[in-house]
UniProtKB/Swiss-Prot annotation:
GO terms for cellular component: 6-phosphofructokinase complex. Belongs to the phosphofructokinase type A (PFKA) family. ATP-dependent PFK group I subfamily. Prokaryotic clade 'B1' sub-subfamily. One of its GO terms (biological process) is fructose 6-phosphate metabolic process. It comes from Clostridium botulinum (strain Eklund 17B / Type B). This is ATP-dependent 6-phosphofructokinase. Its EC number is 2.7.1.11. Catalyzes the phosphorylation of D-fructose 6-phosphate to fructose 1,6-bisphosphate by ATP, the first committing step of glycolysis. ATP binds at residues 11, 72-73, 102-105.
């Protein structure tokens, strides 16, 4: 193996730059050439590749987003399109590809592997929705961004004695909502893993809190449930307490990565190169029990949700 390429795909996550830096510098240290691919699989199809060196990744570990840019590429599901991508990689002399992203990005990597390109995936998504790894790159930073926002919302919620319903990211995974809820002392946490929730029970919880002296309530809602605006109107109507909805949106994706995300991304990126040099392909890198691990992509994606029911139950007790 002489040359590898690296791309970021799907939604951006803080810490992606730290991972890029780790891959590039580890690869160069091992005597490999490195190429960056701009704008994910879409950029790959357009031949947007460029040579990278140590200087290319100087002063980026503290930056949010991704210097390689990112994009979604639904056409990559077409095998003929993927064959075109392989021809482009071959034309540049690329032997292996490191992909930073989520499950969709990993599927693209797996399919490229079947066409002869060695691939390794790094988990870059704020949702923490890849069950094979304890944490994904970007989760910790997004969590801290959310908690900071909740703290500010709580200030105004307290002043106005109102209910604040805060919607956070997490389409199929409630980890952000759960961890943010317990970190901020929320009165209720609503996540997709717990099934359909009872709006009337939520209203009773809020009224019970008021009867015990609570002057305001914070409710954290995962976007996979959605409907924050509608829920706030329902709560206000049934409880008689003013309620407001806040959808945090893309602020959760931005900002300088936390120290934890920088360390995680650096460890994962370095291991990705080591696994490639061992001749492995179609693998993903993750962390379990603070140990860096690698696993077959299919096996990793087949693992069911790792939602922490024990932590949810702790949050339920502490919110009363």
């Amino acid at each position: 193996m002489k040359k590898i390429a690296i791309l970021t795909s799907g939604g951006d996550a803080p810490g992606m730059n730290a991972a890029i830096r780790a891959v590039v510098r580890t690869a160069i240290d091992k005597g490999l050439e490195v190429m960056g691919v701009q704008r994910g699989y879409s950029g790959l199809l357009n031949g947007e590749l460029f040579a990278m060196n140590r200087t290319s990744v100087s002063d980026i570990i503290q930056r949010g987003g991704t210097i390689l840019r990112t994009a979604r590429c639904p056409e990559f599901k077409d095998e003929e399109v993927r064959k075109r991508a392989v021809k482009i990689l071959n034309a540049y002399g690329v032997d292996a590809l490191v992909v930073i992203g989520g499950d969709g990005s990993f599927m693209g990597a797996k399919l490229l592997s079947k066409l002869g390109i060695k691939t390794i995936g790094l988990p870059g998504t704020i949702d923490n929705d890849l069950a094979y790894t304890d944490f994904t790159i970007g989760f910790d930073t997004a969590l801290n961004t959310i908690v900071d926002a909740i703290n500010k919302i709580r200030d105004t919620s307290t002043s106005h004695e109102r209910v604040s319903i805060i919607e956070v990211m997490g389409r199929d995974c409630g980890d952000l909502a759960l961890h943010a809820g317990i970190s901020s002392g929320a009165e209720a946490i609503i996540v997709p893993e717990m099934g359909e929730f009872d709006r009337d029970a939520l209203c009773r919880t809020i009224l019970d809190g008021k009867n015990h002296g609570k002057t305001h309530s914070i409710v954290i809602l995962a976007e996979g449930i959605g409907g924050a605006e509608e829920l706030s109107k329902y709560v206000q109507e049934l409880t008689g307490i003013e309620a407001r909805a806040t959808i945090l949106g893309h602020i959760q994706r931005g900002g300088a990565p936390s120290a934890s995300d920088r360390v995680l991304a650096s460890r994962l990126g370095a291991r990705a190169v080591e696994v490639l040099l061992q001749g492995e392909t179609s693998r993903v890198i993750g962390i379990r029990d603070n140990q860096i691990v690698d696993q077959d992509i299919d096996e990793a994606l087949a693992i069911e949700s790792k939602f922490d029911l024990d932590l949810y139950n702790v949050a339920e007790v502490l919110s009363r």
